[in-house]
């Protein structure tokens, strides 16, 4: 049962990292735009989701948004805790990844942009085929660190009724009247997952250093 909870935590973290990268790319493009309105949209997104607790974001999506939907449609709406958790984690992670990806893009030599313009590539083609591959090579280690953070933050969706690793330990503790063993096991599983991912991060960082 506890390993099932670990699976859900891991899947949530993977999903949030994936969607967070997409949001991060979009947000970074907005913040690097020459247009004031687009830059403002990117800045507002980052400030809102970096400036408020993830727990508040999770509860807002699960409790407040259904109330708004119900008032508009006149029908009862029940949000899914896993979907709300995934959306909140993705939005929060994306806000942090905006700055990571933005710094990676800015780290690419400006001559690359000029070369792409010379051979006739448009902005999207330049980003897709030239700039982003180089930018992501620079930011893979911090992205892996973000993944570790997401694994630990997945425990927050326990507050809205989703059964992940920490929630599973709580249920086992309530059923057995013994919280020591399940909570200790949960801590050990979190530790094993984060240590394994940290080892992967160090390996990747070493490989990237050699390739450079």
Residue ranges of each PLM-predicted region?
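Transmembrane alpha-helices and adjacent helix-loop boundaries
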Residues: 1-212
